[in-house]
Amino acid sequence: RQRQMCIRDRSLAGPFNRYSDNLVTQCVEAGTHYLDITGENIWVRDLIDKHHEAAEKKQIKIIPSCGYDSIPSDMGCFYLHRSLNQELQRIDGYHRGNGGVSGGTIESAFSMRNYKSKYSMGHPFLLNSKEYIKTQNISENRDNFKIKYIDDIKLWSAPFVMAIANTRVVRRSSEIHDK
């Protein structure tokens, strides 16, 4: 049934580490792009290990983080880099918002506690290749998510709940774009 779904383009909700492993495999085998919205980056790292080479050979895209959680950060950095035409050391983005978290997101967060992987979400370059990581200063890129007052905008700021996932997505996109 998943194979037919891959051929016809459908969607599936998370937790992605529980429901989407076979789906991504089927997409790669069928030559179908995979797009989703997950912050389960340890699972995403495992996807990269399992499928990146085959997807690249078939010229298909596996993009597991392409929703509101990641697109503003990822595309904002891309366009800022392109506009300034220089290497960027740090980008801070701010927005005002409110809302809630879906049941699927909560279930995904809890399911990651039991997900077995050799990787750690705490690594700032979790989604990058070993070759790329060798060129980066890991200690300068550690997460520093704090509530703080921002003089430039005269407001208090708290980290976005998905910041730990987004920083890794942006770093991977940067590596892929630089190739």
PLM regions and their residue ranges:
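Short, small-residue-biased leader/transition segments that mark boundaries at the very start
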Residues: 2-7
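Rossmann-fold NAD(P)-binding glycine/threonine-rich loop
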Residues: 38-60
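Active-site-lining helix/loop region of Rossmann-like oxidoreductase modules
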Residues: 82-179
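Adenosine-phosphate binding glycine-rich loop
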Residues: 54, 58-98
